[in-house]
Every structure is written in C-alpha cells, then in structure tokens.
C-alpha cells in the first residue's frame, strides 16, 4: 500500500512524497491518521536545529496525532481495526538503568515517533500496541490529537504542585503556555499570570482565564508580579 507523507529531507526541505506503508510486526498497529499537530519540535527539525534527538533524514515528522486503526499485527489484543485511537510517540526500552528505576523519560534507547522513526505527517503511521490508546466517540479526532501535548502539561502541573489558591506565572503564550494556563486554572490556581509580548496572545489568555497579563518588552516582570509575593525560585 502506498501513502502520501510530508518527508523531512534536510534543513528547510520538506517534501510531499508517495511512500510505502510498512506492514505491521506481530506487536504493531497501523493507524490511519485523521489529525496531526505541529509541535515546536517539528519546527526545530524543519530548520535543522539541535533538539531532543539526532534527526536523520529522510524522516516523516509528527508526533501529536489521532486516527483509526487500519490493521493490527498477529499478537495485538487490545485494539482492532476501526477503533478510534491516539498514540504515545515514545517507545521506551524498559531494560536500561533509567527505565528500571522509574525514570523512563531518560531512556537510553528511546524510539521517538516522528523524531527517530517515521511519524504522523502522513496518511498512516505504525506504532507498537503498547503506544496506542483508545478513546470514545465523545472526543473528536482533533481533540484526541492534543492528548500528547496536554499530557506533557499535566505532568508539569504535577511537578509544580499547582493546587487550590496557587499563584502561577506562565512565561510565553504559545500553545503549551496556553494549555498550562488553563490546566493551572482547573487545578485551582487563584492568580493566573501570563508574560507574553504579542498583544493578541495576551488578549486570548484573558479569555482563557488569566487574571493578569504582562508585556515583558514594556514591563519589568518581577515588579509586575510583586503584588503576588511570588519569588523567582517558585516560578
């Protein structure tokens, strides 16, 4: 089977090509992609910037995706063709020191969908069964494609111990910053502050629940948040 894909061929060289869809191994799932987000990592890859891994072209980027199961390997049991799914782009080895000590994010042998192996900027993507998660019809495909960035932000909320009454300062109003702002509000933060130079983003933040916005090009951020008694080490 042949599919169309956006293939990274080198610095600032992204081409739409027809490429074969890889047959799944026994523990793999072929997903027909419905939506795939464009992450900041994808932008860095396109511009040839150094990032979380050494990207070697040709490669299909994209790691924030949702879709429908098209085909499964012989040993797959948890999903079947037709299931609505989202994918975890990280395939940890489970065998290295970090994996065995609960620090999988430092896995020495991590396989990254869209960074070290082909990803979701394509009609189809192949993942291991353990990386595939079903979701209900109550969730749209475009919403499910946001599962990966939202999960990153949820982890940050936990690490920052955001709770009822917290004061939260978010630096930057890009997609991740806006998600963090909303999640902090859901976690109970009473003061939600965004530092962002772009006016449109500051206005959007106020619509999403920010209690104050700051233009760091015109204001001293530390002075602007002094009324909260927030300290630098708390941000």
Predicted features along the sequence, with ranges:
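NAD(P)H dinucleotide-binding glycine-rich loop of Rossmann-like/cofactor-binding domains
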Residues: 93-171
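Short Gly/Pro-enriched turn/cap motifs at secondary-structure boundaries
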Residues: 9, 20-21, 56-62, 113-117
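Conserved small/polar residues in nucleotide/adenosyl-binding loops
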Residues: 228-235
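Mid-domain Rossmann-like dinucleotide-binding core that forms the NAD(H)/NADP(H) cofactor-binding site
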Residues: 139-219, 223
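Cytochrome P450 core scaffold surrounding the K-helix E-X-X-R motif
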Residues: 42-43
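Glycine-rich beta-strand-centered segment in the early N-terminal region that forms part
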Residues: 22-36, 51-97, 136-139
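Extreme N-terminal starter segment of soluble prokaryotic enzymes
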Residues: 2-4
């Amino acid at each position: 089977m042949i599919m169309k894909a956006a293939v990274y061929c080198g610095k600032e060289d992204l081409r739409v090509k027809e490429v074969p869809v890889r047959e799944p191994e026994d523990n793999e799932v072929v997903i027909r992609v419905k939506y795939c987000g464009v992450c900041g990592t994808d932008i860095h890859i396109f511009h040839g910037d150094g990032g979380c891994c050494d990207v070697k072209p040709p490669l299909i980027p994209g790691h924030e995706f949702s879709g429908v199961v098209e085909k499964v390997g012989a040993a797959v049991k948890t999903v079947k063709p037709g299931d609505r799914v989202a994918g975890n782009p990280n395939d940890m080895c489970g065998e290295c020191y970090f994996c065995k000590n609960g620090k999988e994010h430092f896995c020495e042998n991590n396989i990254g969908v869209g960074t070290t192996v082909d990803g979701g900027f394509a009609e189809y993507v192949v993942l291991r069964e353990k990386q595939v998660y079903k979701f209900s019809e109550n969730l749209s495909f475009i919403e499910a494609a946001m599962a990966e960035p939202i999960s990153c932000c949820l982890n940050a909320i936990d690490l920052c111990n955001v709770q009822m009454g917290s004061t939260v300062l978010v630096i930057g109003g890009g997609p991740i910053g806006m998600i963090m702002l909303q999640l902090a509000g859901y976690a109970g933060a009473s003061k939600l502050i965004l530092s962002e130079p772009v006016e449109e983003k500051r206005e959007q933040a106020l619509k999403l629940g920010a209690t104050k916005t700051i233009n760091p090009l015109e204001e001293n951020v530390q002075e602007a948040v002094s009324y909260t008694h927030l300290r630098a080490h708390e941000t």
